[in-house]
């Protein structure tokens, strides 16, 4: 099976299981420039050809304002796919690192990026936003919430922001990070290196390492955690 067919099978199954796409949807795909968002963009673009429900996609990048940011290869990639590309310019980096000098910037940064993405999606006439969270992101988020916040929870596969009138969908839910990395390498996607000084210095990276260590002695651990989340209907996850 080709890498595209394999990834399409993951995405279509998630989209169908959670009714993520309806006829006439105009979907903003959040593009950070990383492997996850670029994979999602190419697969959703390809799926437009045959999916029974007709939809449009718009690619949106929130430019945080780091000096040296260059999304020209992403723009060319979108042109080849026939997808409109919007770069939302912001001063998020300056606000967080220069003005507020945040010691723990990740939470505020994520909140500000989400706000900018949602605003840009509305301006582009979109009714949904597709995010590139995959299988491993879901497991890591669930474990982080349990370890650091003492609660059982995760992001939802599909949700609705009533204040924005925007749906949020995560079509890569069934694809592992390994699947995404393989797809990225085979398709030679134009990944943009993150310029954030806090990149890889996060609780998520620590949880990723912990799960990798636990998996060595407990094969299939991530899949069992994911299955437990579905069985318990954590935040909209469903057993299939």
Which sequence ranges carry the predicted segments?
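ATP-dependent adenylation/nucleotidyltransferase module used to activate substrates
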Residues: 1-140, 148, 178-186
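Generic structural signal for well-ordered, non-membrane alpha-helical segments
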Residues: 4, 110, 200-203, 207, ...
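Residues that form generic nucleotide/phosphate-binding pockets
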Residues: 10, 14, 146, 210-213, ...
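Solvent-exposed amphipathic alpha-helical surface segments
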Residues: 18, 47, 51, 214-217, ...
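Catalytic subdomain that performs nucleotidyl-dependent activation
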Residues: 57, 136-216
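Residue-level detector of flexible, active-site-proximal loop/helix-junction positions
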Residues: 64-66, 92-94, 159-162, 175, ...
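Short, surface-exposed helix-loop/turn micro-motifs enriched in polar/charged residues
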Residues: 131, 195-199, 221
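A short, charged, Gly/Pro-tolerant segment at domain boundaries
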Residues: 202, 216, 220-240
